[in-house]
Regions:
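Bacterial N-terminal signal peptides
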Residues: 10-26
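N-terminal secretory signal peptides that target proteins for export/translocation
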Residues: 1-9
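Beta-propeller blade termini and top-face loops
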Residues: 26-304
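Short, internal active-site loops enriched in acidic
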Residues: 8-11, 157
Length: 304
C-alpha cells in the first residue's frame, strides 16, 4: 500500500514493534469521540413554518420563536389578553450527560443512552432540570412577540399552564402550582402548591396539558404515572391511579376521570366531550363514559 513500508520481523519483538506503531498512529488510543461535523442543522422558524401542511381554509402565523423562548411546553392567554409560555430546561439531560461520559472513554455505544443512563447521571440531571414561565409582549403591535419577561423561575419541569384566579396554574413534574403577581412588577410573588405527590420517572412521562372544562373543572392528562396526592385544602390523600384527572382551581378537590394510559394531550369541545391522544397510537380517542360509572363495575377493566 502506498505510504507504508513492509517490516520483516518475528516473534515477541515483532509483536511489540507492531503494537508500538499502532499506538503512535493513534489507532488504539481511547480518544474522545467528536460530534459529526456534517450533522443536519435545525430549520429556522420561518423554514419550519413553511413545512406545515394545512387543511383548506386554515392559516398559520409565527408569533414567537427562539431565542425569545426556549423549549416551550405550553401556552395560555389570560383574561387580560396576556400570553404566557412555560418552558422545560433539561429535557433528556440524563442522556446528554451519559453520552459525555461515554465519549470520554472513546468507546462506541449503540444503546439508547437515555434508557441506560447511570444512577449518577440521572441524579445530576434532576439537579439541573428546571421549569420557567415567561410573559410575552408585542411592543410594536405587529402581531409578533418581541419581548419576553421571566415571570416565574426555579420551578420543577413544566408541562402546561392554564389561566386561573387572576394568575396562572402550572402543571409541573411533581406538583400543581398556582402563581400570581400581586404587586404588578412583572414577577410572580405568590407561589401556592395546590397538589403534591405526582410521580415522574422519565421526563416526558409526566402529568401534562391542562384544559378548562365547561363544568369549571381543569382536566389534566395523567401520562400513566400513578399518584396519591395531597393538598392544603384536601382532607386526606386522593388516589388517582393511572388515570387522567380533573381538579378545582382553588385546590379544594381533585379526582380521577376516564382516560387512557400514556395520555399526552387532550382537548374538550364546547359540549364537554373530551378527546385524547396517546403515545401508543396515532388515533384520537373519545371518552363517552364517566369514570364514576366504570369504576363501580368490577367486571369492566378500565385504565388506571
Amino acid at each position: 500500500m502506498r505510504g507504508f513500508r513492509t517490516i520483516r520481523t518475528g516473534g515477541l519483538a515483532g509483536f511489540i514493534l507492531a503494537i508500538t506503531m499502532l499506538l503512535r498512529a493513534g489507532l488504539l488510543d481511547a480518544e474522545e469521540i467528536k460530534p459529526a461535523a456534517d450533522a443536519p442543522k435545525p430549520l429556522s422558524p420561518r423554514e419550519s413554518l413553511e413545512r406545515f401542511q394545512l387543511a383548506k381554509g386554515l392559516k398559520i402565523e409565527l408569533v414567537a420563536s427562539e431565542p425569545l423562548i426556549a423549549d416551550p411546553t405550553g401556552i395560555a392567554w389570560d383574561e387580560q389578553g396576556r400570553l404566557f409560555v412555560c418552558e422545560i430546561h433539561g429535557y433528556n439531560l440524563e442522556g446528554h450527560l451519559d453520552i459525555i461520559e461515554l465519549n470520554k472513554t472513546g468507546k462506541l455505544d449503540k444503546k439508547i443512552r437515555r434508557i441506560y443512563a447511570t444512577p449518577e447521571t440521572l441524579a445530576e440531571a434532576r439537579k439541573q432540570t428546571y421549569g420557567r414561565v415567561k410573559l410575552l409582549h408585542d411592543t410594536d403591535g405587529d402581531g409578533r412577540m418581541d419581548r419576553a419577561d421571566t415571570w416565574a423561575d426555579d420551578l420543577p419541569a413544566c408541562f402546561g399552564i392554564v389561566p386561573a384566579r387572576g394568575g396562572i396554574i402550572v402543571i409541573t413534574a411533581f406538583r400543581i402550582i398556582y402563581l400570581n403577581d400581586s404587586t404588578g412588577d412583572g414577577k410572580a410573588d405568590i407561589r401556592e402548591t395546590l397538589f403534591d405527590g405526582f410521580e415522574m420517572h422519565i421526563i416526558e412521562r409526566a402529568i401534562n396539558n391542562p384544559r378548562w372544562g365547561q363544568d369549571n373543572w381543569i382536566y389534566v392528562a395523567g401520562a400513566n404515572r400513578g399518584a396519591s396526592v395531597t393538598g392544603p385544602a384536601l382532607k386526606g390523600k386522593v388516589n388517582l391511579g393511572r388515570n387522567d384527572f380533573r381538579f378545582k382551581a382553588d385546590g379544594s378537590a381533585i379526582e380521577p376521570v376516564t382516560g387512557t394510559n400514556y395520555t399526552f394531550g387532550l382537548s374538550l369541545t364546547d359540549s364537554g366531550d373530551r378527546f385524547l391522544i396517546s403515545t401508543g397510537s396515532h388515533a384520537l380517542y373519545a371518552i363517552p363514559l364517566p369514570y364514576r360509572y366504570l369504576a363501580r363495575n368490577p367486571h369492566v377493566p378500565t385504565p388506571g
